[in-house]
Amino acid sequence: MKSDFLNRGKLLIGFAMILFCSGLYAENDLLEPTWVRPDTDFSAFNKFQVMPLDVSDVRLLRPPWAMDDPKDWSIDNEDLQLLQDIYRDVMKAILEADGGYPVVHVPGADVIQVEVELLSIMPYIRPGKRETSKGQSYITLGSGEVNAKIDLRNSETRELLLLLEGEKTVGQEYKEHNDTNIVANLEYMFTQFATRLRNAMDRVHGK
Protein backbone atom coordinates (compact mmCIF):
# COMPACT_ATOMS: atom_id res chain seq x y z
CA MET A 1 0.00 0.00 0.00
CA LYS A 2 2.81 2.41 0.91
CA SER A 3 4.60 1.63 -2.35
CA ASP A 4 1.42 2.38 -4.33
CA PHE A 5 0.99 5.68 -2.47
CA LEU A 6 4.58 6.73 -3.20
CA ASN A 7 4.24 5.72 -6.84
CA ARG A 8 1.11 7.83 -7.24
CA GLY A 9 2.92 10.73 -5.63
CA LYS A 10 5.73 10.44 -8.16
CA LEU A 11 3.23 10.39 -11.03
CA LEU A 12 1.45 13.45 -9.66
CA ILE A 13 4.70 15.36 -9.15
CA GLY A 14 6.00 14.29 -12.55
CA PHE A 15 2.83 15.45 -14.30
CA ALA A 16 2.76 18.82 -12.53
CA MET A 17 6.48 19.46 -12.99
CA ILE A 18 6.53 18.81 -16.72
CA LEU A 19 3.28 20.74 -17.26
CA PHE A 20 4.64 23.83 -15.51
CA CYS A 21 8.40 23.37 -15.82
CA SER A 22 10.23 26.66 -16.42
CA GLY A 23 12.65 24.88 -18.73
CA LEU A 24 10.02 24.24 -21.38
CA TYR A 25 9.22 27.81 -22.33
CA ALA A 26 10.16 31.38 -21.57
CA GLU A 27 9.90 32.38 -17.91
CA ASN A 28 7.33 35.08 -18.59
CA ASP A 29 5.09 32.54 -20.28
CA LEU A 30 4.43 30.32 -17.26
CA LEU A 31 1.08 29.47 -15.74
CA GLU A 32 1.47 28.08 -12.24
CA PRO A 33 -1.02 25.49 -10.97
CA THR A 34 -3.56 26.94 -8.57
CA TRP A 35 -4.55 23.54 -7.17
CA VAL A 36 -3.82 19.86 -7.81
CA ARG A 37 -5.86 17.02 -6.28
CA PRO A 38 -3.57 14.97 -4.02
CA ASP A 39 -2.76 11.37 -4.96
CA THR A 40 -4.19 11.64 -8.47
CA ASP A 41 -2.88 8.84 -10.69
CA PHE A 42 -2.63 10.59 -14.05
CA SER A 43 -1.28 7.40 -15.62
CA ALA A 44 -4.83 6.01 -15.41
CA PHE A 45 -5.77 8.35 -18.26
CA ASN A 46 -4.77 7.89 -21.90
CA LYS A 47 -7.40 9.88 -23.79
CA PHE A 48 -8.58 13.49 -23.78
CA GLN A 49 -12.04 14.99 -24.05
CA VAL A 50 -11.33 18.56 -25.11
CA MET A 51 -14.36 20.70 -24.43
CA PRO A 52 -15.05 23.72 -26.68
CA LEU A 53 -13.13 26.82 -25.67
CA ASP A 54 -15.46 28.74 -23.33
CA VAL A 55 -15.80 32.37 -24.45
CA SER A 56 -19.33 32.85 -23.10
CA ASP A 57 -18.37 35.54 -20.58
CA VAL A 58 -15.02 36.82 -21.83
CA ARG A 59 -14.28 40.49 -21.13
CA LEU A 60 -12.42 42.77 -23.54
CA LEU A 61 -9.93 44.95 -21.66
CA ARG A 62 -8.13 48.00 -22.98
CA PRO A 63 -4.38 48.31 -22.52
CA PRO A 64 -3.27 51.21 -20.29
CA TRP A 65 -2.27 53.38 -23.26
CA ALA A 66 -5.76 53.17 -24.80
CA MET A 67 -7.87 54.12 -21.80
CA ASP A 68 -8.72 57.51 -23.31
CA ASP A 69 -9.46 56.24 -26.81
CA PRO A 70 -13.00 57.50 -27.58
CA LYS A 71 -13.59 54.75 -30.13
CA ASP A 72 -15.40 51.53 -29.25
CA TRP A 73 -13.32 48.50 -28.27
CA SER A 74 -15.23 45.28 -28.83
CA ILE A 75 -14.75 41.77 -30.16
CA ASP A 76 -17.32 40.29 -32.51
CA ASN A 77 -18.74 36.79 -32.63
CA GLU A 78 -16.73 35.90 -35.72
CA ASP A 79 -13.48 36.58 -33.87
CA LEU A 80 -14.65 34.51 -30.90
CA GLN A 81 -15.56 31.66 -33.24
CA LEU A 82 -12.11 31.90 -34.81
CA LEU A 83 -10.56 31.55 -31.35
CA GLN A 84 -12.61 28.43 -30.70
CA ASP A 85 -11.76 26.90 -34.08
CA ILE A 86 -8.01 27.47 -33.71
CA TYR A 87 -8.04 26.05 -30.18
CA ARG A 88 -9.97 22.93 -31.25
CA ASP A 89 -7.75 22.22 -34.26
CA VAL A 90 -4.45 22.79 -32.44
CA MET A 91 -5.39 20.69 -29.42
CA LYS A 92 -6.44 17.73 -31.57
CA ALA A 93 -3.38 17.97 -33.82
CA ILE A 94 -0.83 18.13 -30.98
CA LEU A 95 -2.41 15.61 -28.62
CA GLU A 96 -3.00 12.95 -31.28
CA ALA A 97 0.17 13.36 -33.37
CA ASP A 98 2.66 10.49 -33.75
CA GLY A 99 0.79 7.86 -31.78
CA GLY A 100 -0.32 10.24 -29.06
CA TYR A 101 -3.57 10.34 -27.15
CA PRO A 102 -6.97 10.13 -28.87
CA VAL A 103 -9.25 13.14 -28.52
CA VAL A 104 -12.70 11.68 -27.89
CA HIS A 105 -16.17 13.15 -27.56
CA VAL A 106 -17.63 11.00 -24.78
CA PRO A 107 -16.57 10.45 -21.15
CA GLY A 108 -14.74 7.31 -20.07
CA ALA A 109 -12.79 5.83 -17.18
CA ASP A 110 -9.50 6.54 -18.99
CA VAL A 111 -10.50 9.96 -20.34
CA ILE A 112 -9.32 13.24 -18.85
CA GLN A 113 -11.53 16.22 -19.60
CA VAL A 114 -9.92 19.53 -20.54
CA GLU A 115 -11.93 22.70 -19.95
CA VAL A 116 -10.47 26.10 -20.84
CA GLU A 117 -12.35 29.34 -20.21
CA LEU A 118 -11.11 32.70 -21.47
CA LEU A 119 -11.84 35.25 -18.75
CA SER A 120 -10.48 38.34 -20.46
CA ILE A 121 -8.68 39.47 -23.60
CA MET A 122 -6.50 42.58 -23.79
CA PRO A 123 -5.49 43.28 -27.41
CA TYR A 124 -2.62 45.73 -27.84
CA ILE A 125 -4.36 47.36 -30.81
CA ARG A 126 -8.07 48.13 -31.06
CA PRO A 127 -9.79 45.19 -32.83
CA GLY A 128 -10.32 46.00 -36.49
CA LYS A 129 -7.55 48.63 -36.55
CA ARG A 130 -4.71 47.54 -38.80
CA GLU A 131 -2.99 50.69 -40.09
CA THR A 132 -2.28 54.23 -38.98
CA SER A 133 -3.86 57.19 -40.74
CA LYS A 134 -0.72 57.44 -42.86
CA GLY A 135 -0.93 53.83 -43.96
CA GLN A 136 1.97 52.73 -41.76
CA SER A 137 1.70 49.31 -40.16
CA TYR A 138 1.95 48.63 -36.43
CA ILE A 139 4.70 46.41 -35.05
CA THR A 140 3.87 44.78 -31.70
CA LEU A 141 5.46 42.21 -29.39
CA GLY A 142 2.69 39.67 -29.61
CA SER A 143 -0.96 40.49 -30.21
CA GLY A 144 -2.09 41.01 -26.63
CA GLU A 145 -2.74 39.18 -23.37
CA VAL A 146 -5.37 36.72 -22.24
CA ASN A 147 -6.48 35.64 -18.78
CA ALA A 148 -7.65 32.05 -18.71
CA LYS A 149 -8.85 29.34 -16.33
CA ILE A 150 -8.01 25.72 -17.06
CA ASP A 151 -9.65 22.68 -15.43
CA LEU A 152 -8.52 19.10 -15.87
CA ARG A 153 -11.27 16.72 -14.72
CA ASN A 154 -12.14 13.06 -14.46
CA SER A 155 -14.54 12.89 -17.41
CA GLU A 156 -16.82 10.31 -15.77
CA THR A 157 -17.19 11.81 -12.30
CA ARG A 158 -16.43 15.45 -13.21
CA GLU A 159 -14.06 15.45 -10.24
CA LEU A 160 -11.56 18.31 -10.51
CA LEU A 161 -7.99 17.01 -10.79
CA LEU A 162 -6.03 20.17 -11.57
CA LEU A 163 -6.85 23.86 -11.72
CA LEU A 164 -4.79 26.74 -13.02
CA GLU A 165 -5.53 30.35 -13.78
CA GLY A 166 -3.38 33.19 -15.02
CA GLU A 167 -2.32 35.53 -17.80
CA LYS A 168 -0.63 34.56 -21.04
CA THR A 169 0.98 36.68 -23.74
CA VAL A 170 -0.35 35.95 -27.23
CA GLY A 171 2.90 35.70 -29.19
CA GLN A 172 6.55 36.20 -28.27
CA GLU A 173 8.03 38.06 -31.24
CA TYR A 174 7.86 41.53 -32.76
CA LYS A 175 5.65 41.27 -35.84
CA GLU A 176 3.46 43.44 -38.01
CA HIS A 177 -0.04 43.67 -36.56
CA ASN A 178 -2.16 41.97 -39.21
CA ASP A 179 -4.67 39.13 -39.44
CA THR A 180 -2.08 36.56 -40.52
CA ASN A 181 0.20 37.25 -37.57
CA ILE A 182 -2.68 37.43 -35.10
CA VAL A 183 -3.75 33.92 -36.14
CA ALA A 184 -0.13 32.72 -35.98
CA ASN A 185 0.24 34.12 -32.46
CA LEU A 186 -2.96 32.40 -31.33
CA GLU A 187 -1.80 29.11 -32.83
CA TYR A 188 1.53 29.52 -31.02
CA MET A 189 -0.16 30.12 -27.66
CA PHE A 190 -2.50 27.14 -27.96
CA THR A 191 0.34 24.96 -29.28
CA GLN A 192 2.36 25.75 -26.16
CA PHE A 193 -0.45 24.61 -23.90
CA ALA A 194 -1.22 21.47 -25.92
CA THR A 195 2.47 20.55 -26.03
CA ARG A 196 2.84 20.91 -22.29
CA LEU A 197 -0.21 18.73 -21.76
CA ARG A 198 1.13 16.13 -24.21
CA ASN A 199 4.60 16.14 -22.61
CA ALA A 200 3.10 15.78 -19.13
CA MET A 201 1.07 12.76 -20.21
CA ASP A 202 4.11 11.25 -21.94
CA ARG A 203 6.04 11.65 -18.70
CA VAL A 204 3.57 9.72 -16.55
CA HIS A 205 3.30 7.00 -19.21
CA GLY A 206 7.07 6.66 -19.43
CA LYS A 207 7.35 7.75 -23.06
Residues covered by each model-derived region:
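A structural "domain/chain start" motif
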Residues: Y25-I86, D202-K207
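C-terminal/domain-edge helix-coil "capping" segments
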Residues: E27-D41, S143-N147, E156-L163, E167-K207
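Bacterial N-terminal signal peptides that target proteins for export
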Residues: K2-I13
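Second-shell loop/turn segments in exported
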Residues: K71-L83, Y101-V103, E176-A184
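Surface-exposed short loop/turn segments
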Residues: D29-L31, A97-E159, G171-Q172, E176
